[in-house]
């Protein structure tokens, strides 16, 4: 499961060959949590500021917890067929977090070794939130690589550089038939301070003093 990640620091980190339209205004968020907003690249429709988590309802109409993640092995099922054919997106991120029990919840940060952004594959829907129409997204997850496996049994689908445009190409009907995940050698992991366990903690120096903030 991926329910916490670090946003891009600045818009210029998005490759121009993926998006060359108007810049979107956003604030760096080192501890993105469900219902918060970040930039997203929308297949066939440019880019948008999007909400993390797709709202759902029980059959009786009562709200369910938002959909944060969607398993790649379930995307061919009926409820996700439309998303795969028409509603694919990419969430550019600096990295993502997972936890291990080490005398309490110990967070770890996964990112690319050279600091390039991770391009997380996602699906999206448009819905009304507090009177405002907004795109909302869920991050795709798959079997973890060898680095992530000791921390969690799933990991976000971080796309290889040469597969990002393919994922955003709605003319490509079966992108999941290809190897999409970024190579294991690209990833690095390091522990974070436990202050970030609090979703309200947005001060990067409080849990990652060695990182360079935007």
Regions found by a protein language model. Give the residues of each.
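Short linear sequence motif anchored by a di-proline
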Residues: 1-214
């Amino acid at each position: 499961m991926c329910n916490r990640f670090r946003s891009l620091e600045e818009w210029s980190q998005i490759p121009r060959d993926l998006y060359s339209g108007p810049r979107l205004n956003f604030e760096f968020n080192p501890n993105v949590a469900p219902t918060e907003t970040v930039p997203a690249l929308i297949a066939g429709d440019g880019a948008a500021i999007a909400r993390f988590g797709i709202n759902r309802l029980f059959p009786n109409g009562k709200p369910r917890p938002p959909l944060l993640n969607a398993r790649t092995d379930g995307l061919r099922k009926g409820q996700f067929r439309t998303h795969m054919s028409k509603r694919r997106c990419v969430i550019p991120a600096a990295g993502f977090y997972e936890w291990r029990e080490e005398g309490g919840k110990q967070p770890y940060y996964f990112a690319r070794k050279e600091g390039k952004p991770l391009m997380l594959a996602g699906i999206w829907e448009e819905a009304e939130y507090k009177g405002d129409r907004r795109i909302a997204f869920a991050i795709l997850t798959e079997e973890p690589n060898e680095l992530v496996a000791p921390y969690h049994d799933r990991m976000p689908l971080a796309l290889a550089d040469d597969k990002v445009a393919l994922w955003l190409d709605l003319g490509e009907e079966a992108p999941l038939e290809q190897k999409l995940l970024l190579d294991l050698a690209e990833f690095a992991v390091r522990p974070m301070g436990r202050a970030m366990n609090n979703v309200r903690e947005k001060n990067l120096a409080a849990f990652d003093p060695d990182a360079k903030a935007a």
